[in-house]
């Protein structure tokens, strides 16, 4: 799947990429109050029709993703995992995918074996890609 200058392996609802997007990236420097406000704003953005896009790496980003999915809104998740043609997400992400609420994207040029822990550099790169796709560079 080609999105702008980026090429991805994709699993899930590919139509989500054509929706208005909102990147989610909870910064470490946020105070607890800033973090709470930012997370609330992300959920409100989803309620207003924007599809959240992020690697959803931090526990706070995962909380935002989980709330949005529980409310029935879609998300696009970037991952460093290799998405083969037989890949399927597990748990709640499997359910979200089966309901058309999820699109998983993996940059084709950087698949990482499942047993490899994601690095800070990879996290930063995935966040930058999410922000670029959402037009929030």
How would you label these PLM feature ranges?
Residues 1-137:
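Glycine-biased, small-residue-rich flexible motifs in mid-sequence functional cores and linkers
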